[in-house]
Swiss-Prot record:
Keywords: ATP-binding, Kinase, Magnesium, Metal-binding, Nucleotide-binding, Thiamine biosynthesis, Transferase. This is Hydroxyethylthiazole kinase. The gene is thiM. Substrate binds at M40, G189. It catalyses: 5-(2-hydroxyethyl)-4-methylthiazole + ATP = 4-methyl-5-(2-phosphooxyethyl)-thiazole + ADP + H(+).
Amino acid sequence: MNDPLKTIRETKPLIHHITNWVTIYDCANMTRAFGALPVMAHASEECAEMTGISSALVLNIGTPTSEIIDSMLLSAAAANEKKIPVVLDAVGVGATKFRDEMAAKILGSVRVDIIKGNYSEIAKLAGESAETKGVEATSINADPVKIAKQFAKLSSSVIVMTGKEDIISDGERVFIVKNGHELMGSIVGTGCMAASVIGLFAAVNPDYFEASREALCYFGVAGELAARESNGPGSFKVNLYDEVFNLSDEKVRSMMNFEEQ
């Protein structure tokens, strides 16, 4: 769409997160900085109802428990019924059997529109061999673009692989997003924030492939701008929020760096 950020700030979509306890505060603030409204409702007694009044659902398995996974399934079912986008951030898949089983349970039980993870996490979900150290990517043994395309076809979801270059595929098309800065990898939480950003862009754009590209371009441009004013991770994190808050569609269009394959 022509002016997604303007649309977000005018409509202020409510983005329901069931996310991890490490970065929940960061995801809420990043959602707000873009102009959307965050809500973090995890309890099974209310989560589906909260999803029912939201414009997108973002699930993050960074700190999984059986109870939280149950809430994710309830909310995702409500999102499917309402036909709002569901984003799954597969944090730490490949690190433990429990995470792998819970991710598979979600994907096997409900419709997930956008599946996000680093190269290792997506490779593991796609059945490829991959090495993961905690929640950090280490290495994969196959072409990531090929993995993204094949997994998108298999899952009927948009696949987002984040790394030095971000790979997005709907099974037929591929975007390679080159915006961003290495300082984004120096603070905990930018990957989780990226999932929130994808969710809020998908809330206003039903083309989830295009929405994912827009989200990562906008977030990456903000990272580039923040790095110019930063001396290290601490100042960078503060500046990242400020640059997102001060972004405009015109500014991002002049700095977008991506290619389509």
